Amino acid sequence: MNEATPKAPGPRSLQRATRRPVRVPGADAVTIGFLPEAPSTPALVTPDGPGVDLPGWLRSNRDAVEARLLRHGAILLRGFHRGSVEKFEQAASAVCGTLFREYGDLPREGESERVYKSTPYPEDLSILFHNESSHLPQWPMRQFFSCIVAPHTGGQTPIVDCRTVLDRMRPELAELFATKKLRYVRNFIDGVDVSWSRFFGTDDPAEVERKCAEEGTSFEWTPDGGLRTSRQAEAVLRHPVTGEAVFFNQLALHHPSSLDPETRSSLLAICGDQGMPRNVFWGDGSVIDDAVVTEVRDLMDRESVAFTWQEGDVLVIDNMLVAHSRSPFTGPRKIVVALGDMTGGSVPTLSSVSSV
């Protein structure tokens, strides 16, 4: 795949880019194009014939794959092999080298230490848009998904370009996110969500305290043996490679308005704002109005694209350029996940979006 490295354009440039499939000749010939239902992202790569080894192809074309990711934010690799956790891990490793193996927010896939199951959540509910680990001091620049078993209906993993989201957000609201930032408050309660021991990878409270102090996360042990953490994080960042401003956070996923009204009312009555399993505030601790979250959520939904999973599909995303979600589904569904190129701390921040 001897492609010149393409310059990464902004979201408006993406809309003007050609959408005709391009055949890349060679021993492992592939065609690069787009899905009819998703004309700007993800880029679709399919083999021109049988026998193209996906991990080998990715290793041979790593620079071109990286350039495509920076341009489109996501790549869908389809038709290379049947659903296989082993092949998936090899493919992800071909792109990133070392995969992250200490992520406490996802259950580990039993076949591998570097592959995770997707988020366990009721099949009839949506998981809202978020950038993986954007509420934490470290996050993966690359996230991989693969379909091992396709659901009967639904179960898509919609994606949305975070450059476009910021570009089309009301300027006043974008400025608020850049200047006020966000504060994530999390309560680790036995039997609700993930436990603090699994999240931190230790049963030792002293080790948890050490990790929190190292990450700049405030913490408090509750009388019932639970743990409350609070951490301020950016809502808008600059991509460290392209320099583009991106809307990068877990606002929709953590805000109480993401819950159904009955569950939200019950949890608030029992726990209060500060006792919810997950919550997000403005950086100064003030409450974010539901209307703000609804506006952002509606914008992300409008700009999103989705495709139907096929067994063996591998989706690669730039976790800062693209946010993802999950649609409700019926039937068995097995989507596995891998994370790579961990970063954080040195990523450029924005004190204002007025000059973007």
Descriptions of predicted regions:
Residues 2-56, 68-70, 123-129, 138-314, ...:
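Active-site environment of non-heme Fe oxygenases that use a 2-His-1-carboxylate facial triad
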Residues 65:
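Histidine-anchored nucleotide/phosphate-binding helix
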Residues 82-97:
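Glycine-rich loop at the start of a catalytic domain that most often binds anionic cofactors/ligands
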Residues 99-131:
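A gly/proline- and charged-residue-enriched helix-loop-helix capping module
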Residues 135:
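Basic- and aromatic-enriched surface patches that contact anionic nucleotides/nucleic acids
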